[in-house]
Every structure is written in C-alpha cells, then in structure tokens.
C-alpha cells in the first residue's frame, strides 16, 4: 500500500471522527480551553508534534471514552483504535519504532469522576479530542517525526 494512501486514509478518518463528535450536539457547549476541576487527566490542547505523541494522546482518549456509558463513545473509540493502527503504519514507513501506548497508568479515579460528573467529562473529553484531532490533521501535512 503506498504510504500516501495511508496518510490520506489517516486524514479522512480524522475528519470522520471530528464530524462524529460535531454530530453529538452537546459537545458545542464548552470551550476546550475551559478548566474543569477533577478533569485534569483529559489531555489539553498542546501541539502534538510527533507520531508517538499522537498515539499516546489517542490512547488516553480511547481509555477515557471506553469507560463512558454513552453508545456514541463506542463508535468513536473504535475509530480511535483504527486511527492508531494507521499512525503505526505511518511510523513504520518512516522506520520509527512506535511502542503501543497504553494510555494513563491510573484511571482508577475515573469511575468516581464519571459517577459525579459523567456529562461534564464527556463534553470536555469530546471537545478536547476534537481539538487534538484537528491539530493532528494539521501536523500530518508537516510530515511529523517519530
């Protein structure tokens, strides 16, 4: 498979996930920069310059989304898994050794946070994920390093 096709597929999947998030109407009601107490484990918006950092960020989001009860999260989590697979193919094409990122070491507190504020967690996570994906889309055009 030509690597340009993999890169194009990666960008298309990112756009699809961003659209899925946009289709979940309540995600528009919060700024991704908004500080929400207790949700510091959700990655914020910061430049994601390398393929390994992209994979690491997606692993954390995937871990957060799979612990949420909403049906919408299952599809987005599956999309993130596929996106991570594509990033690994891109990394391999650049002779990068990309270890499979595992997300956060401790998300034990997530259960309590979800019980207390599941809706807020979902809104903030999706909003920040959308911003991170848009950043990744931009970075892919710059041919990110390992």
UniProtKB/Swiss-Prot annotation:
Belongs to the leptin family. GO terms for biological process: activation of protein kinase C activity; bone growth; cellular response to leptin stimulus; energy reserve metabolic process; intestinal absorption; leptin-mediated signaling pathway; lipid metabolic process; negative regulation of appetite by leptin-mediated signaling pathway. Disulfide bonds join 96-146. The gene is LEP. InterPro entries: 4_helix_cytokine-like_core, Leptin. Gene3D superfamilies: 1.20.1250.10. This is Leptin. It comes from Gorilla gorilla gorilla (Western lowland gorilla). One of its GO terms (molecular function) is peptide hormone receptor binding.
């Amino acid at each position: 498979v030509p690597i340009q096709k993999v890169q194009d597929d990666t960008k298309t999947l990112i756009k699809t996930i961003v659209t899925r998030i946009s289709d979940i109407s309540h995600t528009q009601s919060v700024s991704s920069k908004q500080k929400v107490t207790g949700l510091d484990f959700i990655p914020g918006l910061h430049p994601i310059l390398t393929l390994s950092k992209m994979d690491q960020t997606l692993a954390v989001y995937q871990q957060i989304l799979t612990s949420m009860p909403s049906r919408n999260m299952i599809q987005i989590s599956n999309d993130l898994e596929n996106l991570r697979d594509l990033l690994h193919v891109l990394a391999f094409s650049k002779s990068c050794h990309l270890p499979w990122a595992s997300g956060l070491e401790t998300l034990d507190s997530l259960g309590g946070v979800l019980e207390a504020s599941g809706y807020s967690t979902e809104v903030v996570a999706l909003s920040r994920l959308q911003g991170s994906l848009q950043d990744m889309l931009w970075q892919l055009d710059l041919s990110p390093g390992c």
